[in-house]
């Protein structure tokens, strides 16, 4: 029996959460080995497991993969979530890069100095309302299909829906004016594998709180 993928990261969302989402949606079970201290990260670096001295790192199918996008692309290819031809893959990449741009803003928000946080939140909300959500809504409207690309599930749908959940934690009303995004969120959330991942007790991680933020800062030696 093949080994399950083993995910090396800290016990929080960060840059691993999208990988958790994609594996879960694909129905591929995985194990996790959490770093608890800076020494745990140093050990991975010193034993040569991290090509660029960085995590996330996933042991999968005999490889030690790093770089979030490379890992996501491998999982998507493995589970037929990456389109049927070059044109579809180009669209999927274009949409997921847009998702990644907004995701990065949300991901780094906890590290924002307190005196700058309100302004940063307002900036993110403005980008959501005027740039990113209208763009994805327009794609869905343009073809009238259930999924972003090729009328079949792809990594673009899964990663966009993960982002929708994250944005709703920041602004519960953000999706209200985008009916097709709301419908996509409901559709993807109803898939048995995703529905299971959204249940309490799954490997999905909660929003970053102060305790986990301080722990992450110590592990990654962030001032």
UniProtKB/Swiss-Prot annotation:
<feature type="domain" description="GST C-terminal">
    <location>
        <begin position="85"/>
        <end position="208"/>
    </location>
</feature>
<dbReference type="Pfam" id="PF00043">
    <property type="entry name" value="GST_C"/>
</dbReference>
<keyword id="KW-0963">Cytoplasm</keyword>
<dbReference type="InterPro" id="IPR036249">
    <property type="entry name" value="Thioredoxin-like_sf"/>
</dbReference>
<dbReference type="GO" id="GO:0070062">
    <property type="term" value="C:extracellular exosome"/>
</dbReference>
<feature type="binding site">
    <location>
        <position position="45"/>
    </location>
    <ligand>
        <name>glutathione</name>
    </ligand>
</feature>
<dbReference type="GO" id="GO:0005829">
    <property type="term" value="C:cytosol"/>
</dbReference>
<dbReference type="GO" id="GO:0006749">
    <property type="term" value="P:glutathione metabolic process"/>
</dbReference>
<feature type="binding site">
    <location>
        <begin position="67"/>
        <end position="68"/>
    </location>
    <ligand>
        <name>glutathione</name>
    </ligand>
</feature>
<feature type="binding site">
    <location>
        <position position="9"/>
    </location>
    <ligand>
        <name>glutathione</name>
    </ligand>
</feature>
<feature type="modified residue" description="N-acetylalanine; in Glutathione S-transferase alpha I, N-terminally processed">
    <location>
        <position position="2"/>
    </location>
</feature>
<comment type="subunit">
    <text>Homodimer or heterodimer of GSTA1 and GSTA2.</text>
</comment>
<dbReference type="InterPro" id="IPR036282">
    <property type="entry name" value="Glutathione-S-Trfase_C_sf"/>
</dbReference>
<keyword id="KW-0808">Transferase</keyword>
<comment type="function">
    <text>Glutathione S-transferase that catalyzes the nucleophilic attack of the sulfur atom of glutathione on the electrophilic groups of a wide range of exogenous and endogenous compounds. Involved in the formation of glutathione conjugates of both prostaglandin A2 (PGA2) and prostaglandin J2 (PGJ2). It also catalyzes the isomerization of D5-androstene-3,17-dione (AD) into D4-androstene-3,17-dione and may therefore play an important role in hormone biosynthesis.</text>
</comment>
<dbReference type="InterPro" id="IPR004045">
    <property type="entry name" value="Glutathione_S-Trfase_N"/>
</dbReference>
<dbReference type="InterPro" id="IPR010987">
    <property type="entry name" value="Glutathione-S-Trfase_C-like"/>
</dbReference>
<feature type="domain" description="GST N-terminal">
    <location>
        <begin position="3"/>
        <end position="83"/>
    </location>
</feature>
<dbReference type="GO" id="GO:0006805">
    <property type="term" value="P:xenobiotic metabolic process"/>
</dbReference>
<feature type="modified residue" description="N6-succinyllysine">
    <location>
        <position position="4"/>
    </location>
</feature>
<dbReference type="InterPro" id="IPR050213">
    <property type="entry name" value="GST_superfamily"/>
</dbReference>
<protein>
    <recommendedName>
        <fullName>Glutathione S-transferase alpha I</fullName>
        <ecNumber>2.5.1.18</ecNumber>
    </recommendedName>
</protein>
<dbReference type="Pfam" id="PF02798">
    <property type="entry name" value="GST_N"/>
</dbReference>
<keyword id="KW-0007">Acetylation</keyword>
<feature type="binding site">
    <location>
        <begin position="54"/>
        <end position="55"/>
    </location>
    <ligand>
        <name>glutathione</name>
    </ligand>
</feature>
<dbReference type="InterPro" id="IPR004046">
    <property type="entry name" value="GST_C"/>
</dbReference>
<comment type="similarity">
    <text>Belongs to the GST superfamily. Alpha family.</text>
</comment>
<dbReference type="InterPro" id="IPR003080">
    <property type="entry name" value="GST_alpha"/>
</dbReference>
<dbReference type="GO" id="GO:0004364">
    <property type="term" value="F:glutathione transferase activity"/>
</dbReference>
<feature type="modified residue" description="N-acetylmethionine">
    <location>
        <position position="1"/>
    </location>
</feature>
């Amino acid at each position: 029996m093949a080994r399950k993928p083993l995910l090396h990261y800290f016990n929080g969302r960060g840059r691993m959460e999208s990988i958790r989402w994609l594996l879960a949606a694909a129905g591929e079970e995985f194990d996790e080995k959490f770093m608890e201290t800076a020494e745990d990260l140093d050990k991975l670096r010193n034993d040569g497991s991290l090509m660029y001295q960085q995590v996330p790192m996933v042991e999968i199918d005999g490889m030690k993969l790093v770089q979030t996008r490379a890992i996501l692309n491998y999982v998507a290819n493995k589970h037929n979530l990456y389109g049927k031809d070059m044109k579809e893959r180009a669209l999927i990449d274009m949409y997921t890069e847009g998702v990644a741009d907004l995701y990065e803003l949300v991901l780094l928000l906890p590290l924002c100095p307190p005196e700058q946080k309100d302004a940063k939140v307002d900036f993110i909300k403005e980008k959501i309302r005027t740039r990113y959500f209208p763009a994805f809504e327009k794609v869905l409207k343009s073809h009238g299909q259930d999924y972003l690309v090729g009328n079949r599930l792809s990594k673009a749908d899964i990663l966009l829906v993960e982002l929708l959940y994250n944005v709703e934690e920041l602004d519960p009303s953000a999706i209200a004016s985008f009916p097709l995004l709301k419908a996509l969120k409901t559709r993807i959330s109803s898939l048995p594998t995703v529905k299971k991942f959204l249940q309490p007790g799954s490997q999905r991680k909660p929003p970053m709180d102060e305790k986990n933020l301080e722990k992450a800062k110590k592990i990654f030696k962030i001032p």
